[in-house]
């Protein structure tokens, strides 16, 4: 970036909403756009939506903006304020490029821009990062105002974000979070999908997914490690011959922001993978980024190529440009055995672009969901029944199918599909958390720790990989047998991270680690910054999909069996606890993964800068951020969590956790 470009960039950041309006702007071609949202507002509510949008602007601009915003609402179902899109390219820059009084605030600006980078975001011009509706902001005025506040604030202030809206900067103190984010916090009785549609159209609430609305998304890498762990362990659990992953076939769907990790994970795990995707822009975007090997548009050609790859035990990934139902049915007709099956379509949002029904083309479906949502819903339900029936035919032959926490089984059951167990009390297939991620990772405190090198230098990321590997190898020498497999998998992951070319957007890394691993890795980074070995500070974070961050009965807490799976104390306590233990920013969201009204989840970001204060904060906050969830899982009588929290108490004498007594089953039956 030249000096002139940098000056112009910084000027546009600091001016916020410009006093002189930019010229009207059309949507760009060549990028994916959000589908038209359904027309849900009454005429009176449409007037209110327009009034709400205009309050960001002085009254003398209303006559120019009102018809434009009204047209956006009619055409797209939302008011995005396209004319306020910034003139500069949207991507994460080195932290020193951001005009800021507070370095912590500058790091948040970097993370926000990464979430909206067209190489990273699903629908960048609608401010959607992933999942079809996972928003960073509701409109571009909110983006501009937020960036202005961040450029001005000091470390004695906190910016408060209400569902994308910057409510204001309030006095606080240096150890308080710089930003507190909430997304979709609504009265529980008003948390149905149509409530989101209405409130989002009014501009008063948004669905932040997980790392979208919390400024912590790092591209598909953010889920690829967990997906690799899931695929590897699914193979191990079902490998009766001991032949390993080579030649195993994995069928799934979705090449969006999160789901796009699946083919890369399949390659790393060593299987043949087929991932169906109806959106050509998404499929070819992942192919261009090197996240999927081949894109095939004919299901017969796909079948032949997959049969050949399975025969030679090739580790290869195929994207099928079409509907996954067609894949399941074609493979059934061809007698092609599928070892593993799942789905990562955005079924948390089935009626507004999260799931495209079989039998409808992509554009046809987009038009119908906006113009005739009731008819579209009928097609979705029919497709889910057909989808489940095809999966059932494969599982009858021995396929291992698991729900990937995207509400597939939930929405299929609501559509009347044959997905319930024999007594009708649960689903016939497990979620991946029930079988794999919960008992093998979360109960032991392992989850998706991540970091971003704010210098933007690949060599900084390479050094952090080396430091993290050194820490894990040292901890591995004394690791108990209960966690040696997890440690070994994570060491292999970090050693291969550079070769696997995972970076899309910022210089970031994902690594599953437990509390001890996270704290020691973070301290190693902080020491390297202090010693001048790293060129800039590091942002620490995690996915909300973690040990403590999310209460979700159909995903993260689906292996909680004491009746508390539908409670949300853990996620809310985590949000509050991170706030006063040193997080730079914190977030709490309604929804995420399984859907609005189905989940409560939260996350954090922490800037470490080589200081003693940073070391104090990282030790305090990271310890709590993991052990809170282990304690809850232990109280639910999860065996691995009981072991893990006892070990944590031995390592930290100040930690005292209430442990469960186990009642005798026969005694209870006699009572």
Please name every model-derived segment.
Residues 272, 337, 400:
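Residue-level detector of anion-binding/catalytic polar loops
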Residues 280, 322-325, 344-349, 405-411, ...:
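Glycine-rich beta-alpha junction loops
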Residues 208-232, 236, 246-249, 255-313, ...:
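Catalytic or ion-translocation cores adjacent to nucleophile or general acid/base/metal-coordination motifs
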Residues 152-154, 170-174, 189-190, 240-245, ...:
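Solvent-exposed alpha-helices and their adjacent loops that cap or buttress functional pockets
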Residues 249-252, 316-320, 402:
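Short catalytic-loop micro-motif centered on adjacent basic/acidic residues
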Residues 1-201, 205-218, 373-524, 528-541, ...:
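Long, compositionally biased, glycine/small-hydrophobic-enriched stretches that function as flexible linkers
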Residues 267-269, 332-337, 417-420, 529-530, ...:
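Short, solvent-exposed amphipathic alpha-helical segments in soluble enzyme
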Residues 317-345, 352:
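Active-site/ligand-binding-proximal alpha/beta "capping" segment
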